[in-house]
């Protein structure tokens, strides 16, 4: 049995610690992910792997959420599921409401929606209630298909993960190895189901790409990496993941998932290979020397800012092309692309300043109020204080930004 509180020992100096510190490189990863998605959707999808950007978001989400829970447990020997859901709601919902409002206005004014000049109720509810992936797969008819809302499918997958994962960790956080092997089994089962869906049932590539039961492993691979860091195997695992051979193999595996165009491979094995290959890459971001080129690029001011804006950029980038499509006569005209990028960056920054920052402060106040009078201050100081010993290996979450 591995306790989440057993975080420090002399041979664990390279193992990332679950703490409340901020790590700019993770915003840099968000910047890479959203850039891949936007560039692909703005006309270069034939050479830029936009879908991999979503996979990056998934992996990062699994890692960060799991780290948050271990940090909370290390500080208070408890996990508050209620507070977690409240923080998630305050983080995700306000920008989503702005997106839905803007989509309604844009499509009503420009009359670009299919079959009408307003956003249909069905697709709006699907976005608000986080089931866009299934709505688009099974219920979305042509007259009800508003393209910008389709982007919410990945939010639905993450929300479904949030519904289950806090309860799993709260029940099993003192039995990390057991949880780890259970999640390995789930990842294997998800791959098996994709193979059955593709080769046995002949289901569409959209199903294996968007359905929660086909993509949740992309989030779980990130959670697995955090779970590995909480086991007694952690020092050996980190040493292995840092070896040049491991990193080269991981890079080649990722490259293979981009260049192999067989549709069966892309619908099934691709996601599993990417999840495994991301583990050495994320480890490099977490434990390498901060002066390394990778970490300096990811922690640069432009990358961090873009990462902080990434959620709103992701939501708005397709919608942002709408005015340009009307004015310039198509989605991939230079004017449409330039105006779309200017709009999405401006809107995302305004949402960040006017909505996301105030919501982040509210989340922190709620967190501090809930902890008032609880004897966790010293424990939290012990956890975050380990950053002096771990240096660049320290990793954690600020619930307002990370």
Regions from the PLM with identified roles:
Residues 21-72, 90-98, 122, 129-136, ...:
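Functionally critical transmembrane alpha-helices in membrane proteins and complexes, commonly lining
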Residues 53-71, 90, 155-169, 182-235, ...:
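Specific transmembrane alpha-helix
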Residues 71-108, 118-126, 154-163, 214, ...:
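Transmembrane alpha-helical segments and their boundary/interface "anchor" motifs
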Residues 2, 11, 54-90, 95-113, ...:
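Juxtamembrane transmembrane-helix termini
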Residues 20-24, 44-54, 117-126, 142-157, ...:
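Interfacial loop-to-helix transition and helix-capping segments at the boundaries
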Residues 1-17, 64, 298-303, 318-402:
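C-terminal "closing" transmembrane helix and its immediate cytosolic amphipathic cap
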Residues 35-42, 105, 133, 186-196, ...:
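Aromatic-anchored segments of alpha-helical transmembrane domains
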Residues 219, 223-224, 245-357:
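Alpha-helical transmembrane segments of multi-pass integral membrane proteins
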């Amino acid at each position: 049995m591995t306790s989440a509180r057993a975080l420090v020992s002399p041979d664990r100096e390279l193992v990332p610690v679950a703490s409340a510190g901020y790590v700019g490189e993770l915003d840099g990863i968000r910047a890479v992910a959203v850039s891949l998605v936007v560039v692909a959707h703005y006309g270069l999808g034939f050479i830029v792997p936009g879908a991999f950007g979503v996979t990056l978001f998934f992996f990062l989400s699994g890692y960060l959420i799991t780290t948050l829970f271990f940090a909370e447990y290390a500080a208070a020997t408890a996990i508050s599921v209620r507070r977690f859901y409240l923080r998630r709601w305050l983080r995700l919902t306000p920008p989503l409401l702005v997106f839905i409002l803007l989509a309604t206005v844009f499509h009503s004014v420009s009359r670009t929606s299919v079959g009408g000049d307003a956003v249909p109720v069905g697709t709006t509810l699907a976005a608000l209630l986080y089931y866009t992936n299934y709505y688009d797969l099974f219920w979305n008819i042509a007259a009800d298909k508003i393209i910008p809302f389709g982007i919410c499918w990945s939010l639905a997958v993450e929300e479904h993960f949030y519904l289950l994962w806090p309860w799993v960790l709260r029940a099993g956080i003192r039995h990390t190895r057991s949880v780890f092997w259970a999640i390995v089994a789930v990842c294997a089962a998800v791959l098996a189901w994709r193979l059955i869906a593709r080769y046995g049932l002949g289901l569409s590539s959209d199903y294996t790409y968007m359905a929660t039961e086909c993509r949740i492993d992309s989030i779980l691979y990130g959670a697995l990496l955090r779970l590995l860091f909480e086991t007694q195997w952690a020092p050996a695992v980190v040493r292995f993941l840092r070896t040049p051979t491991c990193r080269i193999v991981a890079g080649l595996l990722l490259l293979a998932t981009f260049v192999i165009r067989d549709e069966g491979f892309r619908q099934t094995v691709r996601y599993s290979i990417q999840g495994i290959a991301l583990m050495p890459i994320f480890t490099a971001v977490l434990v390498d020397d901060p002066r390394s080129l990778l970490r300096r690029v990811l922690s640069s001011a432009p990358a961090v800012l873009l990462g902080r804006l990434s959620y709103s950029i992701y939501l708005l980038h397709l919608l942002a092309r709408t005015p340009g499509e009307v004015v310039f006569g198509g989605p991939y005209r230079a004017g449409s692309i330039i105006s779309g990028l200017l709009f999405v960056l401006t809107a995302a920054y305004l949402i960040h300043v006017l909505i996301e920052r105030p919501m982040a402060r509210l989340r922190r106040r709620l967190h501090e109020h809930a902890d008032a009078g609880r004897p966790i201050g010293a424990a939290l100081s012990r956890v975050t204080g380990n950053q002096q010993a771990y240096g660049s290996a320290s990793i954690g979450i600020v619930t307002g930004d990370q």
